Design a protein with these regions (language model features):
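Extended, folded cores of ATP/NTP-driven motor/assembly subunits in large transport
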Residues: 2-283
Length: 283
C-alpha cells in the first residue's frame, strides 16, 4: 500500500514539475498581454465631435445605415500576430452619443483621432448640410465621482434578448407603414420628447459604442446563422404514429425569422455596447 501511494506521489511530482511552469508561463503571458493592451489604449488620442444637422433636412434612416457602412472602414480584418500579441494592439471603436441637459439635445461622435477623417467623410457623404465641430467632452461638466452630495445618478446597459444573429426591429418596420417622408413614424420621437422636457441640471446621456467585427477577428455570423437555422428546422421535426420523422412546414413567423437572420448576415457587422445614464441634482 505504501509503495502504491509513493508511486502516485512520484507521478504527481513529475506532472507538477511540468504543469506548474507551463501554468506560470501562460499566466505571465496573459497578464503581459493585458498590460500591453492597456498601454496601447492609453496612447490613443480621441476627438469629441458635435454633429449639427439642420432640422429642415429630411432624410430617411437608410442614410444613417450608409454612414455606418462607411465607418466599417475602421475594421482591421485581423491584426497581424506581432502587433496583436507583442504590442497589445486591439480594434478600436467609435462612440455615437446623445447628451441632453435641461431640454437641450446634442449629438456627438467620440472617435480615435486616426479615424476622424473617415468618420467626418462618412457623415458628410449622407448629410452634406451637416456641421461637424470639435467639442469639449460634456462628461467633464460634472465631478469625476458620482453620485455625490450634489448629484445622483442612475444608469444601465442594454443587451440583445436573443443571440446576435436573430433579427431586431429596425427602421424598415416603421417605414413600411407610411412611405411618405412627411408622415412616416419616427421611432426616436418619444425618446426625444422625454429628453426635451428635462429640468435645469437634469441630464440624460445615451452612448452607443461600435467596433467593426467579422470572421477574421473571431466572429463568423455565417456559422452562427447556420446553427440557429438548423436548430429552428430541428424543432419542426416530429414523429408520426409509425415513428417516421417528418418536418412540419415552417410557420409564417419562422419564415420571417429566417429571412431576418439572412438579411442581417448580409450587413456589415459591429460589436456594440449601449449605455443609458440619468443624472439629476439631489432634492
Amino acid at each position: 500500500m505504501d509503495s502504491f501511494i509513493y508511486s502516485i506521489w512520484q507521478a504527481l511530482e513529475i506532472v507538477l514539475w511540468f504543469a506548474v511552469p507551463i501554468f506560470l508561463i501562460a499566466l505571465f503571458w496573459r497578464l503581459r498581454l493585458i498590460h500591453k493592451r492597456q498601454q496601447f489604449l492609453e496612447k490613443q488620442e480621441w476627438d469629441m465631435l458635435e454633429v449639427r444637422i439642420p432640422s429642415n433636412i429630411i432624410k430617411r434612416p437608410k442614410a444613417m445605415e450608409q454612414v455606418f457602412s462607411g465607418i466599417y472602414g475602421i475594421y482591421s480584418f485581423g491584426n497581424p500576430w506581432i502587433p496583436k500579441y507583442m504590442e497589445g494592439k486591439v480594434d478600436l471603436w467609435v462612440s455615437f452619443e446623445i447628451a441632453a441637459k435641461g431640454g437641450s439635445i446634442r449629438f456627438y461622435v467620440r472617435t480615435p483621432k486616426s479615424f476622424r477623417n473617415l468618420v467626418e467623410s462618412s457623415i458628410y457623404g449622407q448629410y452634406p448640410e451637416a456641421e461637424i465641430l470639435e467639442a469639449e467632452d460634456y462628461v467633464h461638466e460634472l465631478p469625476s465621482s458620482l453620485p455625490n452630495e450634489t448629484f445622483d445618478i442612475w444608469g444601465t446597459g442594454f443587451k440583445l434578448a436573443n443571440e446576435a444573429p436573430y433579427p431586431i426591429r429596425t427602421y424598415k418596420e416603421f417605414d413600411e407603414f407610411e412611405p411618405d417622408d412627411e408622415k412616416r413614424i419616427d421611432p426616436m420621437s418619444a425618446l426625444f420628447e422625454a429628453m426635451s422636457k428635462l429640468q435645469q441640471n437634469e441630464r440624460i446621456w445615451i452612448q452607443c459604442m461600435v467596433s467593426a467585427t467579422g470572421k477574421p477577428t473571431g466572429y463568423d455570423i455565417q456559422e452562427e446563422m447556420g446553427k440557429i437555422i438548423q436548430d429552428i428546422q430541428d424543432k419542426s421535426k416530429e414523429a408520426d404514429k409509425e415513428g417516421k420523422i417528418t418536418r412540419k412546414p415552417p410557420t409564417h413567423g419562422t419564415q420571417e425569422i429566417i429571412k431576418g437572420i439572412e438579411n442581417k448576415a448580409s450587413k456589415h457587422l459591429f460589436q456594440f455596447t449601449l449605455r443609458f445614464l440619468y443624472i439629476a441634482p439631489k432634492e
